[in-house]
Amino acid sequence: MKLNKRHMSKKHPPELDTKIPVRPKTLVFVSHDSRDADIAEAFANLLSDVSAGTLKSFRSSDKKGNSGIEFGAEWYTSIMSQLEDATDVVALLTARSIDRPWILYEAGVAKGKLETTVLGLALGVPLDKVSTGPFGQFQNCGDDEDSLTRLVMQLLQRNPDASPRETLNKSIFATRRRLAFES
């Protein structure tokens, strides 16, 4: 957070500038357990749908499209490159993935080395279960409709080219039901 210098006097204490930074090019890295590939795909599709395709994402398990690791590519190098390019990392925290070392590693690299925003999304597990260990330092998101809507809106606000479509709440509700069913 940056200090707002316009009120730096003895009469007025400094204010914190808490605005969400707008990024010129947004890439959301969707960190997930490979067994949750369908959930990661549903979340990536949600981001694309509500932003009319302007909010791009990467998920290593993508086998259908072009947002995964290409055949023949060195997977570790590809993942590290995408983490470096990411403006945000959304870690999908499910019963299968909470304690998986790879999700912890990706979140650690993103936050510790690259200073990238890490957002934990608890899917099918209580927030208090995911808000321990390394994810205890983050304000994590639950899978209820209001929280999921707020998370998606936060990601959209960081992208100057994205404007949420009117179907945002409908898309989130449908995706939330699918995510709850699959997790």
Predicted feature locations:
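Short amphipathic alpha-helical segments
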Residues: 42-44, 66, 102-105, 133
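Short, well-ordered beta-strand core segments
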Residues: 89-90, 140
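C-terminal interaction surface of TIR/SEFIR-family domains
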Residues: 1-28, 37-41, 45, 56, ...
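Conserved N-terminal substructure of TIR/SEFIR domains
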Residues: 2-88, 113-116
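Short beta-alpha junction loops
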Residues: 63, 95-96, 122-128
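Arginine/glycine-rich "motif VI" loop of SF2 helicases in the C-terminal RecA-like domain
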Residues: 49-52, 108-118, 124, 130
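Generic beta-sheet signal
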Residues: 92, 121-123, 143
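Conserved TIR/SEFIR loop-to-helix hotspot centered on a Trp-containing motif
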Residues: 95-113
